[in-house]
Amino acid sequence: MNKGLIGIVVGGGPAPGINGVISSAAIEAINHGRKVVGIVGGFKPLLEGDTKSVLPLTIDLVSRLHTTGGSILRTSRDAPGEVKKHFKTLMATLKKIGITDLITIGGEGTLFMAKWIEQEARGTINVVHAPKTIDNDIPLPGGFSTFGYQTARHVGVEIVKNIMEDSRTMGRWYFITTMGRYTGHLALGIGKAAGATITLIPEEFSEKRLSFKKAADILTGSIIKRLSMGRDHGVAIIAEGIAEKFDMEELAKYEDIEID
């Protein structure tokens, strides 16, 4: 197969380390005699047939990129319906740009996109995916975490430690919700490292639908146990995936609860 351009595209939400991946991938490719371009704006311009949102990546441009935050190529979140509707346009745009090798940087959704592109290309485009997500919900060989997770965990730990001091000083409880989508990796990582009083993650509950009362009883029990020990304060870490498991019919019975 004729070696055309290597393309790099970022999908999904932001996470620490994106520019470092762009930089290292581009430098390695250039040192092997390849030309590299970045797609500015994630998959959105590709889905719209835009061939102008292309940034040539040179060593001068990316050599210090790893020291900066964010993404030089920006990113986008694309609805599954729009992706399916305009997927043929995306494939045609990649071909027009001249990309024969594609590096996708993103989480679970971008991983599926990479798979679809590889299947649709039928050997005309090689695809490599760099797993990026603070959720750490992509299983990797050797138990490695996805990039972005460790930094998010570290930052979260520092925040929780400060809140724990407020909790102790004020004699009150704080409930903290962490990101993580359907998984509790980030919540558990932060909770363990910070020494939070209690951490609730969805993996602890085998039932498909979690009773709101059950979750509330667990948190209430933790508060009561602390009081029996003479401690009137604490910090609970709650993974956002817990809310995904709640029975909405049960929640409707609690009129005073604001449902986000």
Predicted regions and their residues:
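A short, small-residue-rich loop immediately preceding and capping a beta-strand
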Residues: 5-13, 18, 96-109, 175-176
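Short, ordered loop/turn segments at secondary-structure junctions
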Residues: 11-13, 34, 39-45, 77-78, ...
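Accessory alpha-helical/coil subdomains and C-terminal extensions
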Residues: 36, 93, 101-106, 112-116, ...
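Short glycine/serine/threonine-rich phosphate/pyrophosphate-binding segments
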Residues: 15-25, 46-47, 84-88, 105-115, ...
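N-terminal phosphate-binding or glycine-rich loops at protein starts, especially the Walker A/P-loop
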Residues: 1-50
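Glycine-rich oxoanion-binding loops at beta->alpha junctions
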Residues: 1, 46-102, 110, 134, ...
